[in-house]
Amino acid sequence: MPGLNSVLDIGKRALFAAQSSIEVTGNNISNVNTPGYSRRSVRLEEGMSIDYAPGQMGTGVEAKEVLRHFDTFIEEQYNTKSSNRERWDTLLSNLKNLEMVFNESGEGRLNEAMSKFWKAWQTLAQSPETESTRSALLGDAETMLNAIHFADQSMNTLQRQMGDYIKQDVQRVNEIIHEIAEVNKQIDAHEIEGRNNANQLRDERSTLVRELAKKIDINYIDNGGGDITITTGAGQTLVDGTETFDIKYEGAQAFNSTIPSSDFDGSINFEGKSDYEYTFEVFEAGDVENDTASAPYPPKMKISIDGGETWLRDENGDLEFVYARDSKVTVPNSDLQIWFEDYSSGNEALEVGDKFTVVPKDGLYWYKTSSSKENITPLIKANGESHERRVSEGSLAGYFECRDHYVGRYREKMDSLSKGLVWEVNRIHSQGAGLSKFSSVTGSYSVKSDIKPLGSDSSGLDFRDKFQSA
């Protein structure tokens, strides 16, 4: 029955509600500069009513819960842009270091060394019998080689630095996803929907998600409470509630991906390093064998360096091929050699559509289970876009892109320049004569087998592709 006590109770509840609001407001003010803090407010609700004549009588106000003001849509947009920004910031800072390798403002740089080298040849051509001009050419040649070696070593150092940064990022990503899973567990333990919101834990989780987005592109799905799902931008799950899935930075390796009807039970092996990732797809079926000189020929495979989006072609626009053999075969325009072995049941037949992936470099892998993994190493397609099933944003993507797509390509061009220079200089020089006649000549290169054609992959010659039919 309404009376003085009811009035006092209404006043008491109003004071408690106001006190709660003041405390929350004070907490907001004190944390105005706290990173990751979200503004909070008290949700007030009318107290229960009592049936009484002439009508229901109210019992005042109640502070029901403390709400966290957080816009999920804006947060998702922020994390997406943060991933993109970190990728380009990482690229920018490291490409500046690459730019310094080719800075021509100092002494002994590559351009200056090459200019002196060619001038020394011109001087020698005018007076080839002079010992001093010959010595000057040798000195300038050594200077140029030192400049080339310095540039290559500097780029190699940059790539090793990228590898160290990648290791650090991978370690931190795994730490973050485990921390998020632990916070999810705590949220489930403390939160009671509509009564007790774990706002501090939610802020902590959001801060971790923001940090994760800087490392790797992510998608975030909030199913309520501690039940959230975080995947990579390509869809690989990193966090599912309290369950986690790690990523790992591992060494060079190869994978089989045969079609369902294929009985091939061997494996592809490789030797050598490359900044490319190679995909080989069987174009003409057959049995893996050693001899390519007569029919039936071994399987013929086409080659891709962008995950099978496009296929390598020669200068005439025709597809480049490599044979699938059980002896080493050199992949065109590379230092990579591949071969097939380990046939557990003797099935050496390859079918059209069988695929093999060779990653002759350190790469990034997502583990669904301890024995099931997926290659998520960032990969740039021929059109310049990132591969949709790989990591494409965040600092991890920036480091990989700098290491493989930029520094790696420059090293490839430098290597091609060096090989072309060596071949042309030696070819022209071999047509001349020294000041004294030779009594004997020993070649710098040797063949692996004296029964293999000199221009074949099996010859072992570094310049086998230079041989021409008479």
List the predicted regions and their residue ranges:
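Structural signature of extracellular appendage/secretion-system components
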Residues: 1-470
